[in-house]
Amino acid sequence: MKIIHLQKTERTNMFYITYYAKKHNKFITRKGQYDKPDGTKGKSFISKNGTPCLVYWDLDNEGWRMATGEAKVRT
């Protein structure tokens, strides 16, 4: 599944996202949500080189993360 813009109803709900992390050189799964709890918005976009990207709030580490490329999102 490619990263796509999340619907408004999905933006505040918790989800699990699995994607290949170059930093860790393996597939990782994180618990996150689209927006930060204080209301700061996450975003999804296509990079200049055509790679889909999703910036989301990591609920376990309480920080922003960016998933790039193919990702699987489940609620």
Language-model segments: which ranges?
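A short, compositionally biased
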Residues: 8-16, 48-54
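Hydrophobic beta-strand positions
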Residues: 19-20, 45, 56-57
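Mixed-charge, Lys/Arg-rich low-complexity intrinsically disordered regions
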Residues: 1-7
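Short, surface-exposed linear segments at secondary-structure transitions and domain or protein termini
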Residues: 36-46, 73-75
